[in-house]
């Protein structure tokens, strides 16, 4: 039976939800009803809280299951990154730290304890409201006193300590089974032993050339690191101060990677050490992960090469064009033209790069590499070093062409050069008074480049001695503009008159970023 409403009664017809799509009309009616509910009750905080809670409970059913999971994951992630306010009470700081690490916490006779089963135990001794000692235990290993953690808390660096603890816990994937993690921990001890034995030389040359780089052992709050690259320019700068070995202030400057273990869908073999040496004899649903300290700019060709010897595809941060990415430009419409900034009176190089070489976005910036077999480690290191050299050679051209802000307009004499970029080779062609010349740069070994100078039309070698000289200069500096000054001079060519600066915009914001001024963090 349907009752007939009185003429003065307003009837709201609420649409029944038929699907999970957002219904604006329904939400609007709900808001109107909520206003009526609040007006009918005393407006005090308790009543207001009850009304809001009731409203939220009604709305909760409109979120689908996937949406709820996304929301919960988002909240959990935000909790791990929430800052810990230094001015909060001790109990509040302990609570926030524990929650952000996914731990339980409790008060003890000495202070506080934070615990996550099988992963972490942190015991704090507190006197007069200040932390006096911090004792740590990771992955059920023996507990130890951490001077660094104690110092950080005494300086009020609660958030920084939490972040470093969180990074340590990433060593073993939380999805690993107990048995797999135990096998991974054994493999980690073997890796530490192996690298501790074969990478003891901290010299920059050894870091750059050794098959194992240099291993910096794990400490209280940092995983072990393998440093694998020290570019010639960096070594030259340090040598001016008579420094030839890795220093503490180099730890965050030079590229490195850390070992960790990630869950894998299928069993992989892990290294084990016995009296006969090490062998890959243990199986686990886990894979050795080489976590790079910063994004690594990788061409598509090299990524495929890495994939052939990896347990799975390297983790890609984003896809890009490696050569355009280094310039700092999101998009380049026309041919890229740059001119060197050599000293006054010197002949400049005017580089022209075909825009088509800067458009393909099949390259990538990667963050992690997954080892299939430990014996392939040295091959992966060689691939990374050669790739770093290739990208640095291109960076050297951009760096040499950086136009400083406030440059007055003037005309310079320059040699016009066309640049062709591929992963296999970098080709630079230009005309001289005697013949058209082509300079071809290719990899010849680990962190070694080979330069061939040939006739651009016939392909005949100009002179073997020139090739040797240019190869040596390029490997000493990793600088193509510097190398080219030994290949050609202004008197050998018909020079063009170029008006500079080439760009009318502020080069500090839109121009190519110099490699050594901005660093190589991707």
Swiss-Prot record:
Provenance organism: Caenorhabditis elegans
Record text on subunit structure and interactions: Component of the Mediator complex.
Keywords tagged on the record: Activator, Coiled coil, Nucleus, Transcription, Transcription regulation
Function comment: Component of the Mediator complex, a coactivator involved in the regulated transcription of nearly all RNA polymerase II-dependent genes. Mediator functions as a bridge to convey information from gene-specific regulatory proteins to the basal RNA polymerase II transcription machinery. Mediator is recruited to promoters by direct interactions with regulatory proteins and serves as a scaffold for the assembly of a functional preinitiation complex with RNA polymerase II and the general transcription factors.
Subcellular localization(s) per the UniProt record: Nucleus
Residues forming coiled coils: 13-40
Annotated Gene Ontology cellular component terms: nucleus
Chief place of localization: nucleus
Family statement: Belongs to the Mediator complex subunit 1 family.
Protein name per the record: Mediator of RNA polymerase II transcription subunit 1.2
């Amino acid at each position: 039976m349907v009752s007939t409403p009185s003429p003065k009664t307003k009837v709201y017809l609420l649409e029944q939800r038929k699907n999970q799509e957002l219904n604006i009309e329904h939400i609007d009616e709900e808001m109107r009803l909520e206003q009526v509910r609040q007006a009918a009750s005393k407006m005090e905080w308790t009543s207001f809280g009850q009304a809001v809670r009731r409203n939220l409970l009604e709305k909760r059913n409109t979120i689908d299951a996937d949406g709820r999971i996304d929301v919960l994951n988002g909240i959990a992630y935000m909790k791990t990154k929430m800052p810990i306010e230094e001015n909060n009470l001790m109990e509040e700081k302990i609570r926030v730290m524990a929650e952000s690490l996914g731990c339980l916490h409790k008060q003890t006779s000495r202070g506080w304890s934070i615990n996550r089963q099988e992963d972490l135990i942190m015991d704090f001794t507190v006197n007069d409201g200040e932390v006096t000692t911090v004792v740590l235990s990771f992955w059920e290993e023996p507990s130890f006193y951490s001077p660094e953690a104690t110092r950080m808390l005494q300086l009020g660096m609660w958030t920084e300590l939490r972040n470093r603890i969180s990074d340590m816990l990433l060593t073993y994937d939380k999805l690993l089974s107990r048995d797999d993690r135990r096998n991974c921990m054994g493999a980690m001890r073997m890796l530490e032993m192996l690298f501790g034995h074969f990478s003891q030389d901290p010299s920059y040359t050894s870091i750059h050339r050794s098959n194992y780089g240099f291993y910096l052992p794990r400490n209280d709050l940092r995983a072990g690191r393998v440093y694998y690259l020290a570019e010639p320019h960096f070594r030259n700068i340090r040598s001016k101060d008579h420094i030839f070995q890795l220093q503490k202030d180099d730890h965050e400057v030079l590229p490195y990677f850390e070992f960790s273990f990630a869950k894998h869908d299928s069993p992989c073999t892990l290294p084990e050490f016995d009296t006969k040496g090490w062998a890959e004899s243990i199986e686990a649903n886990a894979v050795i992960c080489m976590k790079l300290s910063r994004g690594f700019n990788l061409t598509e060709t090299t990524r495929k090469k890495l994939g052939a010897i990896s347990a799975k595809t390297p983790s890609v941060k984003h896809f890009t064009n490696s050569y355009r990415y280094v310039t700092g430009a999101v998009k380049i419409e026309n041919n890229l033209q740059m001119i060197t900034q050599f000293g006054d009176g010197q002949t400049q190089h005017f580089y022209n790069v075909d825009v088509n070489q800067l458009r393909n976005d099949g390259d990538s910036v990667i963050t992690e590499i997954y080892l299939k077999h430990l014996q392939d480690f040295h091959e992966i290191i060689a691939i990374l070093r050669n790739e770093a050299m290739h990208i640095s050679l291109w960076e050297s051209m951009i760096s040499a062409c950086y136009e400083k802000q406030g440059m007055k307009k003037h005309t310079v004499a320059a040699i016009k050069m066309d640049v062709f970029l591929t992963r296999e080779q970098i080709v630079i062609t230009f005309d001289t008074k005697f013949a058209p010349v082509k300079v071809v740069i290719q990899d010849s070994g680990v962190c070694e480049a080979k330069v061939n100078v040939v006739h651009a039309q016939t392909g005949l070698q100009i002179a073997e001695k020139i090739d040797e000289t240019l190869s040596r200069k390029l490997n000493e500096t990793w600088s193509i503009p510097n190398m080219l000054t030994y290949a050609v001079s202004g008197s050998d060519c018909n020079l063009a008159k170029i008006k500079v600066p080439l760009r009318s915009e502020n080069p500090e914001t839109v121009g190519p970023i110099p490699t050594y001024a901005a660093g190589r963090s991707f």
